[in-house]
Amino acid sequence: MNDHRPPGADANVYLWDRSGPVDEEIATLEQTLRPLRHRPRSPVRAPLAFARTPPPAGPALAAAAAVIILASVAAIVVNRSASPAPGWGVAAVYGAAVTRDGALVSGATLPVGGWLETGEDARVEVSVADLGVVTVYERSRVSLAAATSEEQRLRLGHGRIEAFITAPPRLFFVETAAVVAVDLGCAYTLDADAEGNGTLAVTFGAVALEANGLVSTVPADGVCRVSADRGPGTPYFADCRPELEASLAAIDAGDHGHDTLDVVLDAARPRDTLTLWHLLFKVDEASRGRVFERMVALSGLPPGVTRDGVLRLHARMLDGWWSALERSW
């Protein structure tokens, strides 16, 4: 049998001889045009006196159907090849910003694998698909790592960004050299140097900072410092007492002394159970008991949560306590 497929048709063999993987778009067209296909006549003799021979419409309709299918396939191929490369649109540029191709202008696209860098007093606003906006501030460098329906991922090489995202949780990510900021539906700012040291501040919603099995969940009005050596620190609220913030920084740096923890416990308010909840995972078991007692004194203990379970870091129990506490934050 002669092969009448055109050159380059190997990728679409289903169209020509229905072999190979089914092309869903071609199969849909076939189903739509099925009523028009040529059907051989039934071998039933017509009455001789009134027999009339209709025009051979079947083959003509079949030919027309083939033309329609070919035209549709051509349109599909053209549309596929003409689809724009994935990327984020540049909504606005204030001041000087550059890419690998030169000066960055409004209306350009930041492609996957591409980067942009802002100069002094510059700012760039980038649209994150249909999910929100990222503002890249002065003296910053970012690159786009992924732009798919499952993941939108930005790398912050250094500098500062502000994200306003309305996506479902765990769809938008920002990487630094030290952590990954996982959006849980929120607005936040993130600063980082080239090594990954920096600070996250959440305006609303929540962000999870993740690195090497460590997770710090930061709600609205929360702040969390990031260390290149230790990853995400312990979150605290921006309006906490100065002595709590200072002692917490010492604990995150490795000072787990009795006196340092005392300062944090004494300075804690009911709202600061955010900080104490995270400290449960960072201190030894003896100190964990002290943190537990202070949390109970500040906010009580919800049903289903026990001292023994907390000291053993029972995951489901701690999640339940978090859910009860966050209502007051």
Regions found by a protein language model. Give the residues of each.
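C-terminal non-catalytic accessory extensions
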Residues: G289-W329
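Short, charge-enriched, intrinsically disordered boundary segments that mark the beginning
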Residues: M1-H38
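Intrinsically disordered, low-complexity regions enriched in Ser/Pro/Gly/Gln/His and often acidic
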Residues: P7-A9, P270, H314-A315
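Acidic, Pro/Ser/Gly/Ala-rich intrinsically disordered segments
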Residues: N2-P6, D10, P56-P59, R100-D101, ...
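Flexible, surface-exposed loop/linker segments and immediately adjacent secondary-structure boundaries
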Residues: R34, H38, A74-W115, G119-E120, ...
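Short loop/turn segments at strand-loop or loop-helix junctions that form parts
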Residues: N2, A49-A51
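Single-pass transmembrane signal-anchor helices and their membrane-water interface zones
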Residues: T28-R37, V44-A49, P56-G87
